[in-house]
């Protein structure tokens, strides 16, 4: 399956390190800046309240994320001359790929939630204070948000960097950059920072193995959505207003619960990310070994 990702790398025509490293970084920075600026006029246009914006339920949130995704695709295809297929948007089995990613993302977050709960590190409160239309609206927002972040770090930068510095250094570098965009998040801890880095490694390894952005995008979406709006944990330090349940950290058990950064700062999440990464590395090595015998 790694052959799919390798075809993306091999099909990149440019051999200039400037075009393969500096240009993609500048394009990515531009896209991130535009993503942040877009929300301002859209909030005024839709007249969203501060509560709607902070809860990701505003129309401005959804529209800005959708525009950012399509703008990213447009700039990447025009400036770096990549096709949507090279960006990981495989045209084969789109629904199946997305559902697989959604399943694995759901399994991952619920596993962490249940383990933390069984270790008595959180108290669970059923609140169900999220109206169905807002629930759907927030889910759609995170569909775009998951794909947006994944196209930046996996779909675009990953094959470009791999062309120059190889896959191993690329995964480390992109995981570091992925961590950097979370540095300003509130309640950040060293374990939280480590886990964000490990999540970057996990997503990169899965994308390297599958070459499928639909799958990793769905995993990213369901992780964030269920974490914040179903089980009610903090999402990378950001509290949520609406949820079905609320997970309140038990005092003195922050190492297990993640405290006010959320499950992403939990030692349980550390172990899970390491386990998933090692399993994907095993699958990659198994595939490579099989290819050598052919």
Regions found by a protein language model. Give the residues of each.
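Hydrophobic alpha-helical transmembrane segments
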Residues: 21-26, 63, 98-103, 135-136, ...
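C-terminal membrane module of polytopic membrane proteins
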Residues: 226-294
């Amino acid at each position: 399956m790694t052959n799919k990702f390798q075809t993306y790398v091999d099909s990149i025509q440019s051999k200039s390190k400037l075009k393969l490293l500096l240009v993609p970084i500048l394009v990515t920075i531009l896209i991130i800046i535009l993503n942040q600026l877009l929300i301002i006029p859209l909030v005024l246009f839709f007249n969203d309240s501060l509560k709607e914006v902070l809860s990701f339920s505003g129309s401005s949130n959804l529209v800005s994320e959708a525009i950012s995704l399509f703008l990213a695709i447009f700039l990447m295809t025009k400036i770096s001359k990549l096709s949507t297929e090279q960006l990981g948007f495989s045209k084969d089995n789109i629904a199946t790929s997305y559902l697989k990613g959604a399943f694995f993302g759901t399994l991952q977050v619920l596993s962490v939630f249940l383990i933390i709960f069984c270790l008595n590190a959180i108290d669970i409160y059923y609140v169900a204070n999220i109206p169905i239309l807002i629930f759907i609206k927030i889910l759609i927002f995170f569909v775009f948000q998951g794909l947006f972040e994944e196209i930046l770090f996996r779909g675009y930068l990953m094959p470009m960097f791999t062309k120059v510095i190889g896959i191993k250094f690329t995964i480390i570098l992109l995981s570091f950059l992925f961590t950097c965009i979370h540095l300003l998040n509130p309640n950040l801890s060293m374990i939280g920072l480590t886990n964000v880095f490990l999540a970057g490694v996990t997503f990169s390894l899965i994308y390297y193995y599958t070459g499928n952005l639909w799958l990793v995008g769905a995993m990213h979406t369901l992780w964030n959505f269920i974490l914040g709006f179903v089980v009610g944990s903090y999402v990378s330090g950001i509290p949520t207003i609406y949820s079905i349940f609320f997970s309140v950290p038990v005092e003195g058990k922050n190492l297990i619960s993640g405290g006010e950064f959320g499950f992403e700062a939990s030692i349980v999440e550390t172990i899970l990310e390491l386990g998933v990464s090692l399993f994907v590395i095993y699958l990659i090595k198994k595939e490579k070994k099989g290819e050598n015998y052919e």
